[in-house]
Structures are given as C-alpha cells and as structure tokens.
Amino acid sequence: MAAKDVIFGGEARARMVEGVNILANAVKVTLGPKGRNVVLERSFGAPTVTKDGVSVAKEIELKDKLQNMGAQMVKEVASKTSDIAGDGTTTATVLAQAIVHEGMKYVAAGMNPMDLKRGIDKAVHALVEELKKASKATTTSKEIAQVGSISANSDETIGKIIADAMDKVGKEGVITVEDGKSLESELDVVEGMQFDRGYLSPYFINNPEKQSALLDNPFVLLYDKKISNIRDLLPTLEQVAKAGRPLLIIAEEVEGEALATLVVNTLRGILKVVAVKAPGFGDRRKAMLEDIAVLTGGKVIAEEVGMSLEKVTLADLGQAKRIEVGKENTIIIDGSGEAADIEARVKQVRVQIEEATSDYDREKLQERVAKLAGGVAVIKVGAATEVEMKEKKARVEDALHATRAAVEEGIVAGGGVALLRAKQTAGVIKGDNADQDAGIKLVLRAIEAPLREIVYNAGGEASVVVNAVLAGTGNYGFNAANDTYGDMIEMGILDPTKVTRTALQNAASVASLMLTTECMVCESAKDDAPAGGMGGGMGGMGGMGDMGM
C-alpha cells in the first residue's frame, strides 16, 4: 500500500480552498448574458467551446492532490445540480465558493464549525421556503420560451422552438435533441404513437413516393404470438373485407403461408392489409401491445386470457383515423380509444416510473407515457460547423431541462434577484447561539454572489448594482444584457424555482462539509528521483582484447 500524507487543520483547509477557487473561477466566467466562453481541449478533433458550467467543471483535474480534493467537491455541486434540475450549475458553483470563502473566515477566527453548519442549514431552509412562496406557475407559452432563452444564453430562437415543441406534444411529451442537417434549427413533430417497426414486406407499399403504406380509417389486429397459418386469420379477413376497410396486423411475427397470402391479396387489390412486427421484447412487448390496444380501443388477442384468432370479431379490433407504415417505423394517428381509458393507462405507467430503479427502465416508461399522451418532438439543431453544433446542442439540452423544471415547480425572477428578495422577506432568522448566528449571516451574505458575478462579467460595478436592487421591491432587478433596471419577469428574465432552489441547497451542503473538515489524507507525492540502478554499468571489464587471448 502506498504511503499517505495526512494534513491537519488550517493547512488542509487552505489547500482545499485553493482548489475550490481554481475550479470556481474557471466556471463562473460563463455566468450571465455577458458571460464568456471556455475552450476545452479534446484528445482528437477540434476543441469544444462551451458556456455550460458543468461541462467546464467536469474537465478540471488538478495536479496537487489536496487542491484537487477541494475542486472535486465543488464539481459534485455542479453535477448534482445538473442531474436534478438540468441547469443552474454555474450558479451553484458560485454559491458554493462564496459560502466556503465567508465560512473559512469564521473557522479561522475560532468559531465552532459544527454550529456554523447548523446555522447554514437553518438559513438555507428559510430561504427555500421564501423561494417557494415567491414562485409563480408557468402558464403561457411565452413564459416557457423566456425560460428556455435565458438558459440557452439569451438565444430567443432556442426558447421559441422549445415552447413550440411543448405546445405540440404537451408538457409531459418526449422532446429529443438531434444534430440537424441545415444551418437553421428545426422542429419535427411526430403526432400520434410511433414505434420502431416497419412493414414485413415491401409489397405492402401503396405510396411509392414516400415508400410507405398509408391506411385510412383502418382496423388494427393485435396478436401476441406468431401467425404462420392463414386459416387462423381467415375469419378476421372476411369480416374486414365485408366492412370495406383496411387492416393493420401487429403480431410477434407474420411468416410463411400467412405472409404470402396477405401479399398476394394486397397485390390483387382484394384486401388492403399491412403486417408489422410488434415493438419491444419480452414483457415490454406485451406492455406496448396493451398500450396500442388502449390507444386504438381494441384488445390484445392472447391465448392466456382465453382468446383465439379464429374467434375474433370486429369489436375486438382497434381502430384509428390514419396509420402510416414505413420501412422502419409505424405511426398510429388519432386512435379510437376512450380518453378516460388512455388517461388511466398513463397514470398506471406513471406509477411504474416512480417505482423504477434503473434509469433505462425509467426512460423507456417515459417514452410510453409520451406515446400515449400525445407524441414525440425532435429538435434538430442547425449550425455552420461541428464545433458550433456541439456548443449549440449543449445549450438546447440545458434550455430543455430548465423549461421542464419551470413547468414542474414554477418560476421566480432571474438574474440573482430571487435570492436577494428571499433574504429580505425571510425576516430575522435566529440561531441557538452566536456561532449559529454567524452561519446564518454568512449565507445571507453569500447569496449576493450570483448577482455580483453577473454584473462583474458584464463589466459593471457589483456593489452599486446590489445596493440598487436591494433598495427595490418585488421583481425589480438588473438586466445585464442592456444595463437597465426594471421588473425582471416583465423583461423576460426568469429562472425555474427548482433550479435556484437546487443550486442553493447543493452549494450549502458541500460548502458545509468543507467548513467542518479538519484532516485530509492523500497519497504521498512520488519521489521523482531515478531509482538506484547498477551505477555506471559493469565498468572495468574492458574489451575482449584486454584479456590477452
């Protein structure tokens, strides 16, 4: 086992704070509308240019082990905030640095770090309650667009695209971000339910231009086993042919004689039918077939529940307004399922989401909810170069997380104003002793840090602006983009409550741990001197000629 260095007290904390400052100073240059970019080296390809706090934090590893321990703890603040709220990573880092900076003065003055921590916790709890009271629900598309714009570094086009996407697929819908193929960012919305299975034979195509099969007002047969014998299907096909409507068959597999007969009948124009494989595998396949049944108002024909193909009636089949089947995807538009049944199914899947233990399961369940509830939107990010594409895509993803957070917990005034107002409205927060009071006081001073940093990055005088904002009331604050004062919400400068709350809680949590640190243990720096070898080699042996042979 390698030897370890053990460092105590003030020296340990000082080295840790140096690491905190290095990381926080690199991250905080990105804060605010006039924040700067950070360029990150890549082992191959072009460097990445970013204005995303957590991306910068993740890249930083320091050579000095003690400094690195401090930096990694602050990195945890940014990562945790990003995981929970999806944004606010730079704010969280700035707050953590400010709380550590203020707190270390009190620790050096001999105050009890544990009482300071208790004071910090009391202050944070009071401030979070005030933020919740000040929070306003997001109701309009305009507010969602404003939240997205602020998070995407004041890019209004990104905010508008996200608001449009939420309008089209609902606030619970799935919105994904992909690389675009043009210079402009675009929104592509898939209405209805889409699953990744296409036609089983190209002979089903009836729309050669799109290379797809279009079915208007079709019946939908859902079967959870293989279909290889056409005799099992005949009763259903005869009933559908009499009704004069098309049919979509979704089964585990349609093969052999059954598939050949369906193709021949389609080519002869006797029947308009398309067969596709059921989506998913195993239990997930059964669940997705059940989803499609609820959406189309049909039943899954399963032998386990005593149903067989030969006895299927038209009442057992689902229906939809239109179905489009491509080579790789099937889209069911406007299924005939009852709204109440669909809602009940969505609730059922949501319960499963809450109980899911793995991220993969949770993601797949959320996709099912979106498909049932209204569709999927794809934002295709356009840019001139790959470097710009990466940077822009990261901003769109941040903005998307921020808008989701705003929908969840509402919004507060942006630009660091919400924290200052929470400090004013929280009134007098009392600790149990002088050291706890000091902990409360240091948090109330530290929460000015985000506004100070925004002003500093915009080239202004931080103290003047902070005093001017504190002299105002409500949403009155400073717009650093154009150096004006006014109502932040009216000016469209909003922050999701969840982002501000999470940033404060995570920053205080990690900063408290640092203040209560008394000892650090790390591997000893390796001695760089070369290991003692065999001296200058086997000197003195001379050449073979010296041996007189």
Swiss-Prot record:
One of its GO terms (cellular component) is cytoplasm. It is an enzyme of class 5 (isomerase). The keyword rRNA processing does not apply. Its EC number is 5.6.1.7. Keywords: ATP-binding, Chaperone, Cytoplasm, Isomerase, Nucleotide-binding. Belongs to the chaperonin (HSP60) family. Forms a cylinder of 14 subunits composed of two heptameric rings stacked back-to-back. Interacts with the co-chaperonin GroES. This is Chaperonin GroEL 2.
